[in-house]
């Protein structure tokens, strides 16, 4: 068996992020956007197998470059009067560059993410609805890692016995156990496959009660005479 341990990094520097985003809203409901993220000293933990001994290390390092560029779209729609849905799609380009111990890497990867949110009205009279959501992320990269795709299916039953006052939600997450991340490393001196077996499934019961009413303060009119209006 390989002995694994955490290896410190006294040269680790703080990470900074610069983000830019532009959105266009069509007919007050369809959203289309472009975005770019530039990371300086991007920090991630990577895995290294010692070439001279039967041991391995986990170490957090700074990447020389980590950029993401992408486009997204949000499409809401209804099916009859009982189903309200929202479809979200995004496509991204990842750029990772740096040196991890003695392994230089310069990689690019195109991948996508799909999400679908659905609300089914089971009973308007009893204020009972069912939420079923699904998400899929295509295979991507992280430094020297190749990361397999992951998916999540969740569902929640929502009951509002007192509208705008009391709500009860029973919710389940990761119903199909699709959030178990799998990574692969395939370099001349580094070959490994890793699966995170932590169980991410969960069931929760939420009770929410709103006390009183929110009274909005009267807004004062702005004196625009000084602007020549």
Label the predicted regions.
Residues 114-160, 166, 171-177, 184-188:
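C-terminal beta-barrel architecture of Gram-negative outer-membrane proteins
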């Amino acid at each position: 068996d390989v002995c694994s341990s955490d290896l410190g990094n006294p040269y680790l520097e703080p990470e900074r992020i610069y983000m830019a985003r532009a959105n266009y809203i069509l007919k007050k409901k369809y959203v289309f956007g472009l975005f770019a993220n530039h990371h300086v000293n991007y920090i991630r933990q990577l895995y290294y197998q010692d070439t001279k001994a039967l041991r391995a290390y986990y170490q957090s390092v700074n990447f020389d470059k980590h950029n993401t560029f992408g486009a997204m779209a949000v499409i809401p729609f209804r099916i009859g009067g009982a189903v309200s849905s929202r479809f979200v799609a995004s496509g991204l380009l990842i750029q990772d560059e740096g040196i991890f111990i003695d392994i230089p890497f310069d990689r690019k990867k195109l991948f996508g993410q799909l999400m679908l949110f659905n609300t089914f009205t089971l009973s308007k009279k009893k204020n009972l609805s069912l939420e079923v959501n699904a998400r899929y992320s295509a295979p991507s990269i992280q430094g020297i890692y190749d990361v397999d795709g992951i998916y999540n299916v969740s569902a929640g039953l929502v009951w509002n016995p007192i509208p705008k006052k009391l709500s009860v939600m029973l919710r389940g997450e990761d119903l199909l156990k699709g959030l178990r991340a799998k990574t692969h490393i395939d370099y001349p001196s580094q070959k490994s496959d890793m699966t995170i077996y932590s169980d991410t499934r969960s069931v929760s019961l939420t009770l929410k009660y709103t006390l009183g009413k929110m009274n909005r303060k009267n807004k004062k009119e702005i004196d625009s005479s000084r602007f020549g209006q």
